[in-house]
UniProtKB/Swiss-Prot annotation:
Pfam family, one: Dala_Dala_lig_N
PROSITE patterns to which the protein is assigned, alphabetical: ATP_GRASP, DALA_DALA_LIGASE_1, DALA_DALA_LIGASE_2
Compartments it resides in: Cytoplasm
Free-text remark on how the cofactor is bound: Binds 2 magnesium or manganese ions per subunit.
Organism taxonomic ancestry: Bacteria, Pseudomonadati, Pseudomonadota, Alphaproteobacteria, Acetobacterales
Protein name: D-alanine--D-alanine ligase
GO cellular component, as recorded: cytoplasm
Amino acid sequence: MSIRRVVVLYGGISEERAVSLISGQQVVAALREAGYEVTPIEVGADLRDTIAALTPAPDVVFNALHGRFGEDGAIQGVLDWLNIPYTHSGVRASAIAMDKAAARTAFLAAGLPVAEGRLVTVEELAEQDPLPRPFVIKPANEGSAVGVHILHEGDNRRTEIARSWSFGGQALVEEYIPGRELTVGVLNDRALTVTDIRPRSAFYDYESKYAEGGSRHILPAQMHPDAFKRALDVALAAHHALGCRGATRSDFRYDDTRAEPGRLVLLEVNTQPGLTPTSLLPEQAALMGMDFVSLCRWMVEQATCRA
């Protein structure tokens, strides 16, 4: 199949809309530089408008959406129904990866290292600590560190967090893993490298991820070689455990305060890695010899094998 016409979907209706707008603009420019005929479609709340904009059908849809509707299997199902090839993972992998509790179950079944944790109701959270402190509270279905809180000893925000919770009736709570934030990009069957993320603040939050100068990225990460290889292996195994396709990015905590090689814990798999100027996957691809235009072209070419 000769690919000429590519639609880039960006924007969306999630908490991560602003990130998606930046990703989409970067992708549109890169694909035009690569020689494709590119049509950007800013996705809003009315699905009928999006479907109408996809008529006539393009050769490929580049999905640059993040969060709800963009990476939870919803838009993937629409594109499958329209029989249009699209980038990144399909319905099932996207839905499971976005549901952090379901992803945990899949990781455990595959024998991958995860933090101790469980789903709790907001009422349970309001009443008492669900785990020994310190622990992390996170939405079950959000990305980009949206809604994430860390509670240490002496922190009295738990009841306030529960009362103001706006991410459904449940939250995922997990033990807090001290140490370093790591990430590994995967392109199909290839784990790229390990990035050590050094946020300017104490926590790798939304601002640290996307603000200019919010974090420092060290790649390849300087760490015990056994742990480095383990991170690559686990990222690839997690990609396959969820049935992902194309590009993903696996996030880890690495507790190097323990005896070597330290404790590596898988946090999540991102099926729609960010493609902003400060994003991690493009940096890793560049280190491996693939510039941003080539990365976007690769993603489009990977979409040709399915519809």
